[in-house]
Amino acid sequence: MSWRGNCVKIFLENSHDVREGRKDENNMKDEYVAYVGTYTHGSSIGIHLYDVNVEEGTLTERKVIPVNNSSHIARSLNGKYLYSIADEGVAVFAVEDDGDLTPINKVDIDGMRGCYLSVDKTGRYLFVAGYHDGKVTVVHTHKDGRLGSLMDGVFHKGLGSVAERNFRPHVSCVVPTPDNKYVCAVDNGIDQIKMYKLNTQRDRLKLVDILRCERESGPREIVFSESGKYAYVIYELMNKVDVFSYRDTGNGPEFEKLQSISTTSANVDQAHDAASGMCLSPDHHYLFTSTAGDNTVAMFHIDPETGCLEKKFALPISGEYPKDIAMFPDGKHIAVANHESNTITTFTVDYEKNVLVQKGRPMKVETPNCILITKK
């Protein structure tokens, strides 16, 4: 697995579809909702459901669906179901026509509370990342929406830098590669991304390679480009994004490092800042990140030829600890879940002036962990 290589930055003309505000007609005809997962130690009781006004870039709270400590949520591949962390297990809900949620069942994951969910490209398997116990769990899913038995569970081993928090495994993200050939398990504690092969015949995860990150970098999340050729890794402790090329060699995954770029504004305190959220714009022309402490959202233009990033801005978001971010489907607005100020803020993204324009007052919601904006 390679870390060599430099990126030649050839920044092409930005997409007129986004820059000139041209809306996708299909997106504008569809109706959308937002789900916000919260901790339930205080007054919140679960997943907050919002109606989304795409044109205005606003959210209107409708109701709260009870579920304990919804630290992360994910939609099924066919869109019919919503998965949520639920204490030491995972709950699944049927998504009704109006976006409301009806409980189906819940399974225990034989470990501590998870922090991240994703599904494979067939929709047959649900992946759970375990931050507290350093575990990767795979759960069978059924066609009727029910969660089935645990397929496999792997505990990471090893030590990090043996300094404060990152001294043992903390799996913070588990996602399949775009070709569905491998499973990437990002370990925030031991500064590694472990690559597994999913053996569906034996119901086992097999470790095939390890991407070793910088010591004390704290990799938090990985996302892939629409083409599947590039991967973006955000680092919680170094407040940066690394760009990698990705391909399957036939003998295993190959990642080649192309670029590193900061997520923060000019005046930062590395000791108290923590890069946290990351998402792509709907047209995949831009990458957005959020950084706690600095309390900013950054926007990067993605070069379509090289996958490399050009930072356009890193601006304050009128909240504390922007733990997660989500783009509206028109690409013109962004929502920020501010975990410690107990708010959600929404902004219009001005691609011409490279600024964020806040939409109204922050909305109160206790300890928001994650936000998902999706079609009803």
Q: For each of these PLM feature ranges, what is it?
A:
Residues 43, 67-77, 110-121, 157-178, ...:
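Beta-rich, blade/repeat-based domains predominating
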Residues 39, 87, 131, 141, ...:
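Short loop/turn segments immediately following the C-termini of beta-strands
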